[in-house]
């Protein structure tokens, strides 16, 4: 809780109600977030599964795939009313450092909208439009973090065409 000192009163406190968020990338639809009653059990489950995984430096592709699923799961739990993506990005930087990778928060800051949108897509499912969880953008983000800084992260490629009746929107131009 000390990292939340001098912030909003609700900072660092699990949310006490269910929520929805209108997502621009989904034409106003929302991800289905975890029921607030289950936040702690979901986080305990995901953290206990991930903490037992070990990766050699040669297994970076496996790490990227696992990291995308793990991050998606804890983000979809959406523990707090505000600040979930920022909190998770800091946590992932610390986790990657623990695993021996030299990373900082710059790429998360410089591509914050892409990162958030990739988390949305990895957590979104809509059978009516034949849309399933898409981890590819999140995998690409982690590839950029760990392997190839030259990878382009373009928000305009992330919109869900089926939700816009094939009328492609212009996504916000923030990184």
Where are these regions (language model features)?
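FIC/Doc superfamily catalytic core
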Residues: 1-175
């Amino acid at each position: 809780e000390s990292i939340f000192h001098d912030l909003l009163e609700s900072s660092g406190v699990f949310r006490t109600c269910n929520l929805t968020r209108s997502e621009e990338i989904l034409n106003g639809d929302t991800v289905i977030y975890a029921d607030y009653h289950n936040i702690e059990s979901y986080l305990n489950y995901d953290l206990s599964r991930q903490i037992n995984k070990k990766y050699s430096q040669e297994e970076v592709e496996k790490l990227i795939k696992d990291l995308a699923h793990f991050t998606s799961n804890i983000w979809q739990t959406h523990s707090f009313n505000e600040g979930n993506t920022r909190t998770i990005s800091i946590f992932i930087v610390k986790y990657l450092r623990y695993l021996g990778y030299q990373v900082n928060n710059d790429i998360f800051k410089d591509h914050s909208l892409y990162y958030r949108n990739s988390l949305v897509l990895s957590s979104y499912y809509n059978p009516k439009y034949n849309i399933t969880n898409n981890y590819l953008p999140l995998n690409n983000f982690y590839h950029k973090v760990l392997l190839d800084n030259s990878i382009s992260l373009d928000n305009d490629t992330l919109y869900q065409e089926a939700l816009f009746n094939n009328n492609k929107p212009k996504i916000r131009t923030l990184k």
